Amino acid sequence: MKFTVTFLLIICTLSAFCSPTSKPQRHISCRFTRIWNIPSCYNEKSDLSEAWLYAIISVMVFCSTILALAIYPYLDIGWKRIDAMNHPTFPAPAMLPLQQVVAGGFVPANQPRPTSPTPTEISYFNLTGGDD
């Protein structure tokens, strides 16, 4: 109820504020709603007064702000999560030990080569038992 009364009061105030004291000059060929005539009517006077344009823009900004404030609590943003403050600020240390760099740039022959990581996918042939 309070929101409705406030909204009606704003509309009444804007309509009283935006009512022109003298009739604006009307140019039928340059209407505000005919966007395709903008290049030819750029310097012409609009059929809508500037006060009405400002009022329309103000109402649109007000409505979009209210909509954004209504939607914001339902957004799942990272910093609003319950466990957002429980995450570490620095990454965990590497699980694999770093390899020692030898002066010559190669691994000596007596050290085994590092094993290749296992593939993440399963081969079709391993599932069927061969290449039938």
Swiss-Prot record:
| Any one Pfam family match given in the protein's UniProt record, by short name | Adeno_E3_14_5
PTM annotation, UniProt: Phosphorylated on serine; O-glycosylated, but not N-glycosylated.
Signal peptide limits: 1-18
Q: Name one GO biological process term.
A: regulation of signal transduction
In the bilayer, the protein is annotated as: Single-pass membrane protein
The record's similarity note reads: Belongs to the adenoviridae E3_14 family.
Query: What name has this protein been given in UniProt?
Result: Early E3B 14.6 kDa protein
